[in-house]
Amino acid sequence: MAHKKGGGSTKNGRDSNPKYLGVKAAGGSTVAAGTIILRQRGTVIKPGMNAGLGRDHTIFALIDGVVTFRNGRNNKKQVNILPC
């Protein structure tokens, strides 16, 4: 017989909060200046024309315009904002 009860329940029961990463404004959508376009961990997608990069690698619009995604140099994905 075991001399202690099962202690598994104290070792379980943790779960991290969701981080809500991903694209927030799809390609072709109209955005205002300051709108978050996508949240990411690391620079998987790079900011292009009229797009800024936050300190947590969030890409946001610098001007009012239309969001476009394309492959930039060295086949890296890039987000551009075209003025409308």
From Swiss-Prot:
InterPro entries: Ribosomal_bL27, Ribosomal_bL27_CS. GO terms for molecular function: structural constituent of ribosome. Keywords: Ribonucleoprotein, Ribosomal protein. Residues 1-21 are annotated as: Disordered. Transmembrane segments: none annotated. The keyword Secreted does not apply. GO terms for biological process: translation. GO terms for cellular component: ribonucleoprotein complex; ribosome. The keyword Transport does not apply. Belongs to the bacterial ribosomal protein bL27 family. HAMAP family: Ribosomal_bL27 (MF_00539). This is Large ribosomal subunit protein bL27. The lineage of its organism: Bacteria, Pseudomonadati, Chlorobiota, Chlorobiia, Chlorobiales.
